[in-house]
Amino acid sequence: MKIVFLECSVELVPRSLWSHPQVLKSARRYGIEPGDLLLDKSLHYNAMAELPAKWKRGRPDILHVALLTTTDSPLYNEGLLRIYFQVYDGRLFEVGTGVRVPKNYERFRGLVAQLLKTERVPPGEGEALIRLHSRSLAEFVEREGRFILMWEKGSPTTTTYVAARALSTGLPIGVGCFPRGEFKRSTLRKASEAYSIMGGAPLKTWGVASRIVYALERLKSPFT
């Protein structure tokens, strides 16, 4: 079973913002170069004012909570759930088995900033906790198949139905991982089907993910 967090609001601070006072302040605080910082709206709100699509950027906290939620599930701990996430530049990363995502948000930010630069953590040889899987969503689809998309404009259904579809087809379940706005058209085109739950109400990423994982557990896991 596979879940992929799509279009995550995760990226390093763009070069155009390196000289902004808020970015420089953050860099001095953490003792690193501006280009090694993760873009974060809570720290760089004013700096982000002129960024294109700023409403979909600078929210790594959403991915943090989503990963904490999914990696804390029996399904993941039994080795039955594979987790992927797509960052802002389009790359997709795979979370290894048995990974303990840092509960401390600042530690998580540092880990993801390193990941975006080295494409695996820890860097070097040995087993990676998180590693690059695909350089684009198109490549991901080639390797893993088209995905079942959770989308508030999709066909209304239940999480049980979505979980059953994923189990019968072997396709990943895609969940948006950004604060507001729409999926890119290129993302929508790569979905095999799209469904909404809870009457199409807008739900938080981790809310959707937790409901889907629980539905998968009820259908698949012997311990639920």
Swiss-Prot record:
The record's GO molecular-function terms, alphabetically, read:
rRNA (pseudouridine) methyltransferase activity; rRNA binding
Q: Which domain of life is it from?
A: Archaea
Q: What class of enzyme is it?
A: transferase
The leader peptide range reads none
Q: Its Enzyme Commission number?
A: 2.1.1.-
Binding residues for S-adenosyl-L-methionine? 176, 181, 198-203
Q: Which SUPFAM superfamilies match?
A: alpha/beta knot (SSF75217)
Pinpoint the site Stabilizes Arg-59: 61
Q: Where is this site: Interaction with substrate rRNA?
A: 59, 100, 103, 107
Which one GO biological process term can you cite for this protein?
Answer: rRNA base methylation
Q: Which Pfam families match?
A: EMG1
RNA-binding: is it a keyword of this entry? Answer: yes
Q: Which UniProt keywords apply?
A: Methyltransferase, Ribosome biogenesis, RNA-binding, rRNA processing, rRNA-binding, S-adenosyl-L-methionine, Transferase
Q: Which CDD domains match?
A: Nep1-like (cd18088)
The chemistry this enzyme catalyses reads: a pseudouridine in rRNA + S-adenosyl-L-methionine = an N(1)-methylpseudouridine in rRNA + S-adenosyl-L-homocysteine + H(+)
Q: How does it assemble?
A: Homodimer.
Concerning its family, UniProt says: Belongs to the class IV-like SAM-binding methyltransferase superfamily. RNA methyltransferase NEP1 family.
Which NCBIfam families does this UniProt record tie to the protein?
PRK04171.2-3
Q: Which PANTHER family match?
A: NEP1/MRA1, RIBOSOMAL RNA SMALL SUBUNIT METHYLTRANSFERASE NEP1
Function according to Swiss-Prot or TrEMBL = Methyltransferase involved in ribosomal biogenesis. Specifically catalyzes the N1-methylation of the pseudouridine corresponding to position 914 in M.jannaschii 16S rRNA.
**Name of this chain's protein:** Ribosomal RNA small subunit methyltransferase Nep1
Q: Which organism does this sequence originate in? A: Aeropyrum pernix (strain ATCC 700893 / DSM 11879 / JCM 9820 / NBRC 100138 / K1)
Q: What is the lineage of its organism?
A: Archaea, Thermoproteota, Thermoprotei, Desulfurococcales, Desulfurococcaceae
